[in-house]
Amino acid sequence: MSESSSKSSQPLASKQEKDGTEKRGRGRPRKQPPVSPGTALVGSQKEPSEVPTPKRPRGRPKGSKNKGAAKTRKTTTTPGRKPRGRPKKLEKEEEEGISQESSEEEQ
């Protein structure tokens, strides 16, 4: 039984070598090495004079997890002194925040 299975796998491997395309497992295919523009054919290039646009990263940048609040909210501070850390909420600010939420619900 085991002999027949090993025989069947050998011809398949030889066919793949003849085709020139190696098929690996079901996982993600390997990234092809980048081809330098000097070795590529000049006739195959569509726009040789225009510089191709660089690829932009997808999704959220790595270091931007906790930076959203710093950009959106500007605090007024006394000149010459920079407060560090999270600002403390005053009781008045908390009450104003609650009243604003209730007024939005009514509209």
From Swiss-Prot:
Annotated compartments: Nucleus; Chromosome
Omega-N-methylarginine sites (modified residues): R26, R58, R60
Phosphothreonine modified-residue sites: T39, T53, T78
Result after altering R60A: Decreases methylation by PRMT6. Abolishes methylation by PRMT6
PTM info: Constitutively phosphorylated on two or three sites. Hyperphosphorylated at early stages of apoptosis, followed by dephosphorylation and methylation, which coincides with chromatin condensation. Isoforms HMG-I and HMG-Y can be phosphorylated by HIPK2. HMG-Y is not methylated.
Positions of region (Disordered): 1-107
Post-translational modification N-acetylserine, affected residues: S2
Composition bias type Acidic residues, residue spans: 93-107
Positions of post-translational N6-acetyllysine modification: K7, K15
Effect of mutating R58A: Decreases methylation by PRMT6. Abolishes methylation by PRMT6
Phosphoserine: residues bearing it: S9, S36, S44, S49, S99, S102, S103
GO MF assignments: 5'-deoxyribose-5-phosphate lyase activity; chromatin binding; cis-regulatory region sequence-specific DNA binding; DNA binding; DNA binding, bending; DNA-(apurinic or apyrimidinic site) endonuclease activity; enzyme binding; minor groove of adenine-thymine-rich DNA binding
Highest taxon of source: Eukaryota
One biological process term in Gene Ontology: base-excision repair
Keyword Repressor set for record: no
Subunit structure, as described in the record: Interacts with HIPK2.
Associated pathology: A chromosomal aberration involving HMGA1 is found in pulmonary chondroid hamartoma. Translocation t(6;14)(p21;q23-24) with RAD51B.
Protein known as: High mobility group protein HMG-I/HMG-Y
Organism the protein comes from: Homo sapiens
